Structures are given as structure tokens and as C-alpha cells.
Amino acid sequence: MLKTFSIGGVHPHENKLSAHQPIITAEVPAKAVILLGQHIGAPAKPVVAKGDVVKVGTRIAEPAGFVSAAIHSSVSGKVAKIDTIVDASGYAKPAIFIDVEGDECEETIDRSKTLVKECDLSAEEIVKKIADAGIVGLGGACFPTQVKLCPPPSFKAECVIINAVECEPYLTADHQLMLEHAEEIMVGVSILMKAVKVNKAFIGIENNKPDAIQLMTKVASSYAGIEVVPLKVKYPQGGEKQLIDAITKRQVASGALPISTGAVVQNVGTAFAVYEAVQKNKPLFERVITVTGKSVARPSNFLARIGTPMKQLIDACGGLPEDTGKVIGGGPMMGKALVNIDVPTAKGSSGILIMNRKEAKRGEAQTCIRCAKCVSACPMGLEPYLLGALSENGDFETMEKERIMDCIECGSCQFTCPANRPLLDYCRLGKGKVGAMIRARQAKK
């Protein structure tokens, strides 16, 4: 019997329209806009100024705190300005604007396709190279990888879990990455194991990707301690806590860190980026992004430079369809509608979903009918109908007591609601307000 997580979950239509589309190297943009806050934590601090000349891979911003990440130029050219731009979240964020000239790369970066298996570095040296390369979690959370690889002394890592689930509908970037770079991913997994000093790793893949399971299992057989675990298809299996539950049958307690279960979870794209950083001296300046939608002429998977305008990738797929109703950064369950399509891609950009007008139209919200479908669907064991009502009424103190901070914003509640209640919107609002309350309390101590 296939493994899966134990609480809640839903089954949205997969719509993997770009599955098995080879990864296309996107054109280098004429201008790149590289955000300074592409990760959880403090935005990076610029180390370049207007007029400076940069190459592909040049560090242009340094970490501004313990939880932060370095930023590197994805292009060669000249810094035009440091200013703000509205990003995919809809907020104005600081960014470095670069006018592209040529495509000159830093000499230390190995751009060859030669596989490098052996890694003689110590755990500490590996973590430093990962930090220097600006690696973050590529599954969406964008947590700085070097921080995750150095858990508090009171916790001990027992295994590495690689998230290759890609449960979000439409997105296929991770699937195609496994099909084209299985060997490099395995080396990356081995490096992660060495970094956290464990001898066991699990790669979780849902069984709607049989080709990836077969290939990754075959390649893993040559690497000590790595096991591919086929999983039952259920959303949101790619959630960190849900994946730990599915593979180890250990549940992360409310308010606890995932490392409390002994598991260090990394995305499969992150494992590939770790390989490139440690074995090829390549910083994180490009990633695979799916551009898709039912009306899109050519749904595709692109290897795109960070800072490429999303419009450029959309145009490479045939442009915006006439019946476009909404453009989503990410997937339909957890993604957010874009204010405009000129926003730049970032480290966390996994996909661009173009929805037609029929798909994009929301049903009119009705009064809650107390059916409890949202309660059954919630993978965190919360009561979304209650959280929604509390958020709507501004009762954020009670929301905190009802564990709103445990919400992973997966959208399962809203997906299953027959009354079309905007439950995810309410939960996001409440979570933001409660988070601000908690930070204010801590600041007074």
C-alpha cells in the first residue's frame, strides 16, 4: 500500500499540460531586475552600486542576518540603478536593475555538463559553499538552505527527505528536472547527507510520475543510503510536515520545528542547486519554471535566469491568450494573481499559470452551511470555517488560540467549500495579523 500523510487532503485535477516537455533554455533578458528579498528572512544588502560592471555569477548582495541569503547576478552588464519594483506578491520591494551586455561568466564557475561525483569537502565546508552560492529552498518557501542544514544543538538529524512530490496542479518543473538530471540530483542528495551527517535519505515521489520513480530508483541504486519512496497522489503532499508524516509516520507538533522529528527536508530542485554550487562553483542564478495553462499555445518548462520578466517567458509560449482571465505566479492552489506580467522571476518562481476567464471566475461567496468539508480537508487538523469567521470579524486574538499559525496556506479548505467562501484569503489575512501581534509582543521583552 502506498504511503501518504494521515490527516486531510484533497484531489484537485492535475492538469499537467507541460509534462514531458524538455527543459528549454530561455533567452537572456535585455534587462534583468533582481530582487533583494527572494527568501524568508532579512533582504540581502547590496554590495554593488550604479555603474558597476557585473558578470554572470557575481555576488551583488550579501546576507543581512542569520536568516538571509546572498544574491548573485544572473546576467553580465552594468548596474543601472537600485530601486523598488512591485514583485509577484504585489508589494514594492528593493531590487537591483541591470542593463545586459553580452553573457560573460565568472571564471570560477564550471558551466560544463561533465558529471562530478566525488566530494571531499567536510560538512562545514559544504555548508559554507551552499551559503556562498545563495541557495534557498526551491519548493516555494525559499528558506535559506545553510540555516536548515545547521539545526539547533538540541536537535539531531536522522535522515534527509527530498521533496520531489510536485503536488501543485499544472506544475511540472521538478518532474522534468528529475528526468533530465537524475544523476546530478543524486550527487546533490549525497552532499546534503554529508552536510547534516546522516547515512539515510528518502526521495518522495507521487505515483503519477512512474517514469521519474523508475529512473530515480535505478540511479539511486548506485548511491549508498538513498531510497526512492513512491507516494499516493494526494494534495498537499509536498507540504514539509505532510511529507515527513507520509514517509516517517512522525508528526510535527504544533509550534515545533520539522527537525524535531529528525528529518531535514529539501526540495529536489534544491538538491540539484546544491550539486551545482558544491561541485561546479555555480551560484543560484537560474532555475526551471513551468509556463502553462489550458489556452496557452505551447505549455513549456524553461531554464530561466533569475530576474527575467515573466512576460518574456509567456511570449516564448505564444503570448497571452485572448481569453486570459488571470495570471498566477505559482500554481492554482497556493499561487497568487500577478498585478502585471512584467514582474521579474525570483528564486521561488516555480511556475506561471495563465487561467482563462471561465477558470478565473470565482463563484459568489455564500453563507457557511456548516458542512465541515473544510475541516475534513485541512491537513493540519484546523477548523477553517471558524478561522474564516474569526478573520472576517477581526477577532485575531481568538485566531491565535485556534492555531492559525499552524496553517500552511495550502488552499484545501477553499477548494472544497461548496459555499465558495474565500477561506484561504481569510486565513492569510489572519495569519499576517497574528504574526504581527506575536512579533510586537516579542519586541517588548
Where are these regions (language model features)?
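N-terminal, Lys/Arg-enriched amphipathic/low-complexity engagement segments
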Residues: M1-V47
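Short, well-structured beta-strand-loop connectors
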Residues: A49-E62, K81
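Conserved hydrophobic positions within beta-strands
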Residues: G77-V79
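Acidic low-complexity segments
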Residues: V86-F143, S154, P210
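Gly-rich Lys/Arg/Thr-decorated short loops/hinges at beta-loop-alpha junctions or inter-strand turns
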Residues: E106-E107, G137, V160-D174, S295
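Histidine-anchored nucleotide/phosphate-binding helix
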Residues: L179-A195
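Hydrophobic alpha-helical positions that pack around
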Residues: V198-M310, A316-P321, G331
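Ferredoxin-type iron-sulfur electron-transfer modules in oxidoreductases and energy-metabolism complexes
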Residues: S349-A365, V375, P379-K445
